[in-house]
């Protein structure tokens, strides 16, 4: 997603906890002719979000496009979910996207242009085994996106969500590490395969661009037709 935005001309700030991975991703973008700067930070620390937002705006100025891609899925059985794991999941997946976005809204409002792209999930509308807390958080993302749109779209800030199907990421490693489960997931789609990371690039650029000027509060499933069946 970051690579697609950089390829479309955006100057990208990559934020996360894993310094080496961030630096590597930024270097790949720069080698391809794009602009990218890594910012190492723990987004789950809500009290530090104002500071993180300031750091994000130092390299290139006002943030006009925010992709809320941080997330966690602990895959715990319902009977084993603790208050701690529930709070961790709901905090990072649902609270942080709102409070981080709010840090950038004033700058977007002054520019008269802003794009907030949240990450929903198949579990926003489907119940999966050991996905109670994660599913609750991702269902919340869809309503959060609508509420953000209602609050900020009149200021030129469009708020939409992408709901990916099964893509090979750190969160879905348990699926892709098991050939049988990976095959099952592919068979649930209409196209007969799981997602490739490049499949997310086009919709990310579209939601970030002026082409989406009249689209807000929407959640679009990028799942190869998983939810169509």
Language-model regions: role of each:
Residues 1-13:
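Canonical Rossmann dinucleotide-binding motif of NAD(H)/NADP(H)-dependent dehydrogenases/reductases
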Residues 67, 153, 158, 215-217:
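Short, small/polar-rich loop/turn modules that mediate ligand/substrate recognition or access, typified
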Residues 77-78, 82-90, 116, 185:
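Substrate-binding pocket helix/loop in short-chain dehydrogenase/reductase
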Residues 101, 137, 145:
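Active-site helix of classical SDR
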Residues 106, 150-154, 213:
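Alpha-helical segment proximal to the catalytic Tyr-Lys
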Residues 121:
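Residue(s) in the substrate-gating loop at a strand-loop-helix junction
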Residues 126, 205, 216-229:
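Short C-terminal tail/terminal secondary-structure segment
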């Amino acid at each position: 997603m970051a690579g697609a935005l950089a390829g479309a001309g955006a100057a990208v700030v990559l934020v996360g906890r894993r310094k080496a991975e961030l630096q590597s991703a930024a270097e790949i973008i720069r080698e391809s002719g794009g602009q990218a700067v890594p910012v190492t930070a723990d987004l789950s620390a809500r009290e530090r979000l104002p500071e993180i937002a300031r750091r994000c705006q130092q390299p290139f100025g006002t943030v006009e496009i925010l992709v809320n891609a941080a997330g966690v899925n602990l895959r715990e059985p319902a009977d084993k979910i603790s208050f701690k794991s529930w709070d961790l999941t709901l905090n990072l997946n649902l609270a942080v996207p709102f409070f981080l976005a709010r840090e950038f809204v004033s700058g977007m409002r002054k520019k008269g242009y802003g794009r907030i792209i949240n990450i929903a999930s198949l579990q926003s509308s489907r119940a999966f085994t050991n996905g109670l807390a994660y599913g609750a958080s991702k269902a919340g993302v869809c309503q959060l996106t609508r509420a953000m749109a209602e609050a900020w779209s009149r200021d030129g800030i469009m708020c939409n969500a992408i709901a990916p199907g099964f893509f090979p990421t750190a969160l879905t490693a348990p699926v892709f590490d098991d050939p049988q489960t990976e095959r099952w997931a592919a068979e649930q789609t209409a196209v007969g395969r799981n997602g490739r990371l490049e499949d997310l690039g086009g919709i990310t650029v579209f939601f970030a661009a002026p082409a989406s000027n009249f689209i807000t509060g929407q959640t679009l499933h990028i799942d190869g037709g998983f939810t169509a069946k």
